Amino acid sequence: MARQKDPAVRTQLLERAARMLREREPITLRSLVEGTGVSTMAVYTYFGGMDGVWRALRQEGFTRLAARFETLTVPDDPVEDLVAGVAAYVVNALEHPDLYRVMFDATVELEDVEAAEATLQYLVRAARRCREAGRIREDLDPVLLANEVWTVSHGIVSLVVSRVTSRRTLASGIPLLTAVIVAAGDDPAACRRSVEAGWAALRPPQGRTAMASTSTT
């Protein structure tokens, strides 16, 4: 009778690989399992080899992003909803910078392309709500707006994660996103209020350790 796979072993190896990326350690079959208590055979059992490890790492970034989206409470304000979505994207990148980098490594195949692409649909749905509520022009494609706000957030957090700029740069998300959504047809004052609310929605309460992950200072 074949032994059942233990999900904890798979998670352990993925987390070790992510940690090795963070510490700039070369990842090989032997170095990956070193100190884990499992043999090199586990890499083949759970991933089919090192190529599978890289695919799983890339997929894991999208999996965690999707899980974060699932925790969001949908507000009545559709613009706040849209911005809260990209704020969640930013926080996910800040909390998992190594997985974030691998997410966009096109040289590595994804395990589930559709699941990865589905993460964008959260933003598309929110952008569609904006149009239905009359906050943006009726002739504007929600997919276009979703891509525009994602591009802004991706650019900002990429600079921060790569340490080109400090976390103070995150504060620029408010005026930049406001400009994008106002250009799409929203009222400037209402838009600013909604963007500020959405951008702040993912900040943990004061006193929690996670506060450091979302601080703009």
Identify the role of each PLM range:
Residues 8-17, 32, 57-61, 65, ...:
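Generic hydrophobic, amphipathic alpha-helix propensity
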Residues 12, 20-52, 56:
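Helix-turn-helix
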Residues 53-61, 103, 119:
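Alpha-helical DNA-contacting segments of helix-turn-helix folds
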Residues 59-82, 114-118, 129:
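Amphipathic alpha-helical linker/stalk segments
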Residues 70-99, 142, 146-149:
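Hydrophobic alpha-helical connector segments
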Residues 94-110, 158-162:
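Amphipathic alpha-helical segments used for helix-helix packing
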Residues 109-135, 143-151, 175-178:
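Amphipathic alpha-helical packing segments from all-alpha helical-bundle domains
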Residues 125-133, 162-217:
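C-terminal peripheral helix-coil segments that are non-catalytic and often amphipathic
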